[in-house]
């Protein structure tokens, strides 16, 4: 998965999350920010969100931000 949008969609699908608001709660992002990740308007996920996601999900921050390394920690 090369794009942020692909990675966010994959995480939401894997975690069985359907609402952007619910995904945002995992990392402290607003629904608007999650929407912009999903549509490609924001091309990358800031470290502050990635590390919060790493803390609350099985996904690694490096993979969340860059699409590199192991998907799961």
Predicted segments — roles?
Residues 1-18, 22, 26, 62:
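A short, Lys/Arg-rich alpha-helix, primarily the initiator
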Residues 12, 38, 49, 57, ...:
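DNA major-groove recognition helix of helix-turn-helix
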Residues 28-45:
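Recognition helix of helix-turn-helix/homeodomain-like DNA-binding domains
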Residues 47-63:
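DNA major-groove recognition helix of helix-turn-helix/homeodomain DNA-binding modules
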Residues 63-73:
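Short amphipathic recognition helices of helix-turn-helix/homeodomain-type DNA-binding modules
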